[in-house]
Design a protein with these regions (language model features):
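Extracytoplasmic small-molecule ligand-binding "clamshell" domains
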Residues: 34-102
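C-terminal motif of bacterial Sec signal peptides marking the signal peptidase cleavage site
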Residues: 25-29
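Ligand-binding clefts/hinges and TM-proximal coupling segments of bilobed small-molecule sensing domains
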Residues: 78, 155-171, 210-211, 241-279
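Periplasmic-binding protein-like
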Residues: 122-130, 199, 203-237, 260-279
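Extended ligand-binding regions for polar small-molecule ligands
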Residues: 63-71, 134, 154, 223-262
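Acidic, polar ligand-binding/catalytic clefts
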Residues: 79-142
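A ligand-binding cleft/hinge motif common to bilobed small-molecule-binding domains
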Residues: 88, 104-113, 161-162, 184-185, ...
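Bilobed "Venus flytrap"/periplasmic-binding protein-like clamshell domains
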Residues: 44-47, 57-70, 127-180, 190, ...
Length: 279
């Protein structure tokens, strides 16, 4: 009897241990049930695009994601938002951690080796953010002798130095908020990245910063999905077309760039979403 009870206790402990391991491997099976929901990766730290604020999520990428999810049959309550840092986006899709990613995710041939895209849902252009009262910087060629901030790991500042202003002084910060702070305080003269990201920062500055408004590159923002899922790409593209046609796309741009006078480059926007579909 003693042996039997001891054996049972050992078996129970083994089962409990295995269950704990299973929980760490599959959240969907242990409490955080994701059945019937859609998991969407966004940025949590980009004002105007993807920003986590008091437990809610706001921004243009968020608005586009909500619209797409609704067209796919999911309510806002059925969306599970997951942070998608730039360096982790491909891995998150490959590992099945998310169903799609909308996180200023530029469509490139290199990335398409690992994942697929739908879209584009927006075409951004590299631009400059300056102080509201600074009229000396009207384009990248005006940055010689100036101090320019960009985010660590970005190639945007190097592009300016190589192509437009060889004498610009470069400074890196871990995030755009830190670059904006450096701009506020006069440590740098400008910040560079995609124009819509800069517009979000300008909107959050309450009129203290402005976007120069002369983009000099093109970045096609796509919806990252698992490689080869052409059916999902088609559905997402159809949703983006609907969003553009019913005015929701334009409203989302306006709502998330208030007070900046920001206008997307009309040469490329609104875009034609045809990425990822079967030929």
């Amino acid at each position: 009897m003693t042996f039997t009870n001891t054996f049972k206790r050992k078996v129970c402990r083994v089962i409990a241990a295995l269950a704990a391991v299973a929980c760490t491997m599959s959240l969907a099976a242990c409490g955080a049930d994701e059945t019937g929901k859609i998991r969407i990766g966004i940025k949590f730290d980009q004002p105007g695009l993807g920003f986590k604020k008091s437990g809610t999520y706001v921004g243009f990428d968020v608005d586009v994601a909500k619209y797409i999810a609704k067209k796919l049959g999911y309510s806002e309550d059925q969306i599970i938002w997951k942070e998608a840092p730039s360096k982790q986006r491909e891995a998150m899709l490959q590992n099945g951690d998310v169903d799609m990613i909308l996180a200023t995710y530029s469509i490139t041939d290199e990335r398409k080796k690992a994942v697929s895209f739908a879209g584009p849902y927006f075409v951004a252009g590299q631009d400059l953010l300056v102080r509201k009262d600074d009229n000396s910087i009207n384009g990248p060629e005006d940055l010689n002798g100036k101090r320019l901030c960009s985010v660590t790991g970005s190639t945007s500042a190097a592009t300016v130095k190589e192509k437009f202003a060889s004498e610009v002084q470069l400074m890196e910060q871990p995030g755009y908020a830190e670059c904006a702070t450096a701009l506020f305080s006069g440590i740098v003269d400008a910040v560079t990245t995609d124009d819509i990201i800069l517009a979000g920062l300008a909107s959050a500055s309450r009129g203290k910063l402005k976007v120069v408004g002369k983009p000099f590159t093109q970045e096609h923002y796509g919806v990252g999905i698992k490689k080869g899922d052409t059916q999902l790409a088609t559905k997402i593209n159809n949703a983006i077309v609907d969003m553009i046609q019913d005015g929701s796309w334009e409203n989302a741009i306006s709502d998330n760039t208030k007070g900046t006078n920001y206008t997307p480059d009309v040469r490329y926007n609104p875009p034609t979403p045809d990425e990822g579909e079967e030929a």
